Structure formats: structure tokens, C-alpha cells
């Protein structure tokens, strides 16, 4: 796909909504509230925002600028800037190839629960064995996995403007509205105020270096960094779009949805689950075990639960679309394939790679890799190992190989870059140290040596 043939977002709004859709995913909803509650409430929020304005801003701006400067996806972009460092692009490209299949498996779980709440089966979801019974099956997990990844493929097949951009323009506003409505309902419920205080009031007794580390890790994984996604979306960005302000708006979306997720979940858990912080949990247990019980206990819970899982589905879909679009873009650039054959190949490969994750809690449940289920292993390799390595190499590449000026000049081609001094300091000195700490803590966390 040459630069002349390359698709583009129609303007700034389309780019921001698509990139924000990529950044807003399951991690915003099932991990951020848990970490905020665990690590000091308001203190965690403050640390997270400060890191977003510095560390997150710098990494995202660098990736988008690399994409726009070269007009290429991750594999070819690094090669175009310096042939010796093309391997960074290959590492970045491997991340969405690994993540898309298992993420789509989880997306299928979300669709299953959304259907349960919309079809009158919500009361059964509160049973302790409902979730384990579902994921340990064969036909149902595979069916919902196929449906989710099929919808993703159809959107990507439609192209950047008619598919990715148009879907983002519909889903993101609905996602924001649903988040606000559910958050308002949650915080105004009887008994919810204790949860609001627990979430928002600073608790200095829980503040430590681990608070910063947890906020750093959450921000890093939440913003779709080091996956080639922002490079790909940057390559679709028009040259006259203000890159710096676009990044700020993406961060506002991402942080805002994460904040609202906390207001949706924590007060509701306090109000309808006996007010116990221990009830929170994170990940699938929060989403698929705790929340159905919360909805069952609240007035109008079936409707609120359906709205909640629609919201979560939209968050999952906008992220999976960006993952598949990135892999398809790489196939187009690297192998000179058209969009349709690229989509077919990526879909087929993702289904094959995703099947072990879909069946890993059932018929293949006895198979473990370094003591992990298939889905957990793929998550560990991509999130805990490859993403920090790719981000570290990107910082070194920008900071010391092509130099920050190359990126600053690209950003300033559309508007003055107000934070260029901050960008240079963070990309060269601060971000590499942060990323090494994230890598170490992620590996230790995965093996239960140091829990975050």
C-alpha cells in the first residue's frame, strides 16, 4: 500500500474517536477501578493523571508521529526511518497478532453476558458456577468467539473511513453516554456514598512507590502503546491535523472513561454487596461474577446490567477493531496484499490462534504453558514481556537514533509543539527507566512474586 493509495481519517474528529476507541478497552473497566480503590483512591487518580500528562503523552505522541511521518504501518515505519532498526517494527507487529485472538475470546464472553441480560436470562448469571460452566464448555465459547471476531473483521473489511472511523463515531458517543448514565445511577443509589468516598478520598496510608508503579502500568497498558496501533492510526492521519491536541483529547477520553468506570462499579458494589472493599476484585471475576450479583440486587438491575454489558462490548469492539486494523495494515504494506485478502488471512489466523484460549478452560484445560492457561500465557507474553520491550526500544530509537528533533519537526508541521522540551526529556531519560520498572514488576506480578 503506497502513501498515495493509503486511506485516511476524514479529519481530526474521526482520528481522535478511533484512537480513543482503541485506548478505551476492558482494562479501563475491569482493572482501573480495582487499582484506584486499592492504592489510595484520590492519590492514585492524581498520580495517574500526572503520568498521563507526561509519560503517556510522550509515548503516544512519538508513535503517532512515527506513523504520520512515514505513512506506513509499524513494520515498514521503523525500516523507513533507519533500516538497521526494522526489527523493532517486527516486534511491535507481533503484539497485536498475539493479543487479537485471546482478546476476541474475552469479547465473546462479554457478548454472551450482554445477550443473557437482554434475553431474560440475567437471573441465572448470579449463580457461582454460571461463568465457570460457560467458559469450560465447547460450543458456546467458540460460537461467541467466532461472532465477536467476525463482527470485528466486517468493520475492518469496510476500510478506514467507512469502517473504523464510522463505527467509532457511533460507538464512542454511545459509550460515553452509557458511562455517565450508569455512573449517575450508581452514585445516587442508597448506601453508595461510602463507595464514592472510598474511591475518591485520598488515603495516604495506602500511598507508596507501588502506587506509582501500579498507575504507571495501568496507564501503559490502557493507552494502546507498543502494539503498533498508534503508528498505524498515525499513518492514516492527515498532515494538517494538530497532533499534540489530538493526543491530549485521546488521553481525556481514555482517562475519563476509566474514571467513570470507577464511579459505575465501586459505589454499586458498596451499595449492593454489603459495602465490602474485598468484594471488588479485578478482571473477569469483577466483570462476570461480581457485577451480575450487583445488578441482581439493585432496582432495575436487568436494564442497567444490559446497558453495562453493551458499554463493555463497545469498549471491547473498538479495541479489537484497532488490533485487527493494525495487523491488516501490516499485511497490506509488507506483502502488498489488498484489504480483502489481508482481512481473510488475518481472520483465519486469529481464529486458529484463538481456539486454544477459547477451549483452554474446558477440553484443553489440562494443558498448561509454564503453569498458565493458554489465555493467561498469551496475555503474559504480550502484555508483560513484549509490550515493555517494544516501548523501551522505541524510546531508545527516538531518543538516540533518529533523535527527538525528527519527531518534534513532524509534530510541528501542523501546529507549534508546546511541550517539546518535556517530550525530549521524557523520551530520552524518564520513559526508559519507567518502562524497565514496568517490565520487572509485570513479570514478578505474573508469577505471584510481587502482586499489583
For the regions a language model picked out, list residue spans one by one.
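Membrane-interface "cap" regions at the ends of multi-pass membrane proteins
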Residues: 1-30, 59-64, 68-80, 84-87, ...
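Helix-loop-helix connectors at the membrane interface of multi-pass transporters/channels
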Residues: 2, 107-136, 236-240, 245, ...
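Membrane-embedded translocation segments of transport machinery
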Residues: 2-5, 9, 13, 165, ...
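Inter-helical loop and helix-membrane interface segments of multi-pass membrane transporters/permeases
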Residues: 3-6, 34-39, 69-91, 104-163, ...
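Extracellular loop-to-transmembrane helix junctions
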Residues: 7, 36-62, 88, 140, ...
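Loop-to-transmembrane helix boundary motifs in multi-pass membrane proteins
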Residues: 8, 13-15, 22, 141-143, ...
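Transmembrane helix-boundary motif of multi-pass solute transporters/channels
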Residues: 11-51, 245-248, 252-255, 286, ...
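C-terminal membrane-solvent junction of multi-pass transporters and transport-like membrane proteins
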Residues: 91, 137, 335-347, 379-435
Amino acid at each position: 500500500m503506497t502513501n498515495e493509495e493509503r486511506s485516511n481519517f476524514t479529519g481530526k474528529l474521526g482520528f481522535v474517536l478511533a484512537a480513543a476507541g482503541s485506548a478505551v478497552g476492558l482494562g479501563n473497566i475491569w482493572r482501573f477501578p480495582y487499582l484506584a480503590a486499592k492504592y489510595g483512591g484520590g492519590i492514585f487518580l492524581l498520580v495517574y493523571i500526572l503520568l498521563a500528562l507526561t509519560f503517556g503523552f510522550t509515548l503516544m505522541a512519538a508513535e503517532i508521529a512515527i506513523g504520520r511521518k512515514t505513512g506506513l504501518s509499524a513494520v515498514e515505519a521503523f525500516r523507513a526511518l533507519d533500516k538497521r532498526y526494522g526489527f523493532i517494527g517486527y516486534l511491535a507487529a507481533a503484539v497485536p497478532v498475539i493479543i487479537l485472538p485471546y482478546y476476541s475470546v474475552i469479547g465473546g464472553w462479554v457478548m454472551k453476558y450482554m445477550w443473557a441480560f437482554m434475553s431474560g436470562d440475567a437471573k441465572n448469571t448470579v449463580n457461582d458456577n454460571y461463568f465457570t460452566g460457560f467458559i469450560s464448555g465447547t460450543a458456546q465459547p467458540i460460537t461467541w468467539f467466532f461472532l465477536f471476531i467476525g463482527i470485528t473483521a466486517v468493520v475492518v473489511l469496510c476500510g478506514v473511513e467507512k469502517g473504523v472511523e464510522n463505527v467509532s463515531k457511533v460507538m464512542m458517543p454511545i459509550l460515553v453516554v452509557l458511562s455517565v448514565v450508569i455512573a449517575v445511577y450508581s452514585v445516587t443509589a442508597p448506601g453508595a456514598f461510602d463507595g464514592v468516598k472510598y474511591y475518591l478520598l485520598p488515603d495516604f496510608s495506602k500511598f507508596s512507590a507501588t502506587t506509582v508503579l501500579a498507575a504507571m502500568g495501568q496507564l501503559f497498558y490502557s493507552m494502546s502503546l507498543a502494539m503498533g496501533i498508534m503508528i498505524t492510526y498515525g499513518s492514516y492521519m492527515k498532515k494538517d491535523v494538530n497532533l499534540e491536541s489530538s493526543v491530549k483529547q485521546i488521553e481525556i477520553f481514555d482517562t475519563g472513561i476509566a474514571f467513570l468506570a470507577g464511579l459505575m462499579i465501586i459505589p454499586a458494589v458498596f451499595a449492593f454487596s454489603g459495602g465490602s472493599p474485598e468484594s471488588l476484585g479485578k478482571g473477569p471475576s469483577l466483570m462476570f461474577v461480581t457485577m451480575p450479583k450487583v445488578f441482581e440486587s439493585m432496582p432495575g438491575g436487568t436494564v442497567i446490567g444490559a446497558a453495562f454489558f453493551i458499554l463493555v462490548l463497545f469498549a471491547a469492539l473498538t479495541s479489537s477493531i484497532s488490533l485487527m486494523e493494525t495487523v491488516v495494515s501490516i499485511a497490506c504494506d509488507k506483502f502488498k496484499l489488498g484489504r480483502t485478502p489481508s482481512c481473510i488471512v488475518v481472520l483465519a489466523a486469529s481464529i486458529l490462534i484463538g481456539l486454544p484460549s477459547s477451549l483452554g478452560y474446558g477440553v484443553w484445560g489440562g494443558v498448561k504453558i509454564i503453569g498458565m492457561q493458554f489465555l493467561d500465557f498469551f496475555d503474559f507474553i504480550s502484555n508483560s514481556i513484549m509490550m515493555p520491550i517494544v516501548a523501551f526500544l522505541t524510546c531508545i530509537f527516538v531518543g538516540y537514533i533518529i533523535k527527538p528533533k525528527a519527531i518534534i519537526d513532524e509534530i510541528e508541521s501542523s501546529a507549534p509543539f508546546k511541550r517539546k522540551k518535556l517530550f525530549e526529556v521524557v523520551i530520552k531519560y524518564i520513559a526508559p527507566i519507567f518502562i524497565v520498572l514496568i517490565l520487572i514488576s509485570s513479570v514478578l506480578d505474573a508469577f505471584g512474586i510481587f502482586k499489583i
